[in-house]
Amino acid sequence: MTNRIPHIFSAVLILLVACSRPEQAPQVISVIPQPAFIQQSEGVFSIDRKTSIFVEAGDSSVIRSVAFLNDRLLKAAGYSLPVVADDPLRHAGEKGIFVLDAGLKAEAYHLVVEEGRVVLEHGGGAGAFYGVQTLLQLLPVEIFSEKRVRGIHWELPCCDIEDSPRFAYRGMHLDCCLHFFSIDFLKKYIDVMALHKVNRFHWHLTEDQGWRLEIKKYPLLTEKGQWRKETVIGSLSSGFYDGTPYGGYYSQEEVRDLVKYAAERYVTIIPEIELPGHALAAIACYPELSCGLEDHYETATKWGIFKQVYCPKEETFKFLEDVFDEVFELFPSELVHVGGDECPKASWKKCPHCQALIKKLGLKDEFELQSWFIQRMEKYINSKGHQIIGWDEILQGGLAPNAKVMSWLGEEGGIKAAQQHHEVVMAPYPKYYLDYWQADPDSEPLAMGGPTTLRTMYEYNPVPEVLSAEESKYIIGVEGCVWTEYMPTPARVEYMAWPRMCAIAESGWTKAGKDWGAFTRRLETHLGRLDRMDVGYCKAFYDPFIELHKDTQYSKIATISVDAPDAEIHYTLDGSTPTVQSPIYTGPFVVNRQQRVSAVAIRNGKTIGNIRYKDF
């Protein structure tokens, strides 16, 4: 179909649509990620039991996409809308939501809301799905409730939205090795991703601390490799262990179910099988994969980098090829992640086989041996119709010909790869690392470092300025990374990931210039959606963040900020509780020894967050 349909509809509506409602203030539109173009007008479209959804016959992917709207309506409103698969022109005079194939790009959509109808144009199932996600965000936040909500008018503000993504790859990562998470939680994780138009789930499945994927040819990987005998308590340096065996793995049946679930939400799952480092759990099961320099190997019980890595010998390559053969049966993704990071070379330096191989191949050193290792695996993976992506370190010793780079060590690796005309996903720490503190460490749970605040993540530009226009084309996307050393529960994952992932999602989708103030206003509404989805996000958005900067031996300079829009910060210096009568923060000030800075955010005369303090 072509764009003739909306024009015909417009002509018909001149006759059929009348202003039957009194004028009213337009609802504020708060969509995350921000659409490329949005224009709001007066009026609303009301959804009720008489509303129908009209789709073109035979388009099963679009029918599945609009089913997500009905699923939400059934839970929150108590009813769903009839879906009419027919020629929409035959129903031009009826009240409804018209979902039309207008030949747009795959993920693009065009949404027009008028008082008499809604038209959602797309170029296929993905565009229709993303249009539905935006449509849901135009409705009252109660649409995300799991139980029926009474007394709500299910109204869409009249508007015109044209939208398409900035990047093809919009990713979110989850490490399920350092801590294990159930399939039910992963489905919820994917649901929240999909709401934000995030379309890649990078699933970290193998590590030193546990192997999480069933491989039928190598049953010990899950019979033994899933387990570690105990886990370090607290930080890496604590020296204390809990003495409790820890394990968990995903059966192939569970994986297939999750892959299907994700695909229905236009999320592609990219599995990560680490090589040649971070392999201790596998080596503990099959010691012949190592260089054989130790008498005993066991799955790691603490975090960090371990010297036990895969030995580049035929037994190892046969093992890895067998593993990937089963991986390819489970994951239809063209991309597979091969890790490639943090591979110590100590074993290879001592290993007679490795040294002989370096000499035989005419390699310069162990770094080039790692490059050869990865290139050999890339050839096999390419032969099976797949492509590899790996962390920055795959650049060391020479980049495999067809490899994509996931830049995590700052921007340098991404810049270098893009300049070599290799595609890059930007996932730099600390900018996109969600295991870092997001607020004052004094009031936050244990984390890897930081802080990396919501604002820092929002304002980061994932396309480095040093790249030329041509080189910038090789930046294909972004990813937020969730490493779970200090996230033992689903609740902690949600707390660390959201709402910061909202900022990363917007950087991945939205092309336009950034506006922090506008983002926070949209986000405040959006948090109501996350509340109703039972997402346990961090509420530091409402809390003052106090920082003390060096001044003199006897004084420091205090700065205070808060993310919540239109909030005043009130503070005290004498240890008393700040109230609306306390001084308003207007800029940096001097703090002397033995003073306590206490601060709270207040809006419209009411406290909106927690009181925070900092002692000097």
Regions found by a protein language model. Give the residues of each.
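Contiguous, structured surface segment used for ligand recognition
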Residues: 20-167, 492, 507-520, 524-533
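Short, compositionally stereotyped local motifs that mark structural "simplifiers"
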Residues: 31, 54, 63, 520-616
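Active-site-proximal loop/turn and secondary-structure-junction residues that shape catalytic pockets
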Residues: 205-209, 217, 273-279, 342-344, ...
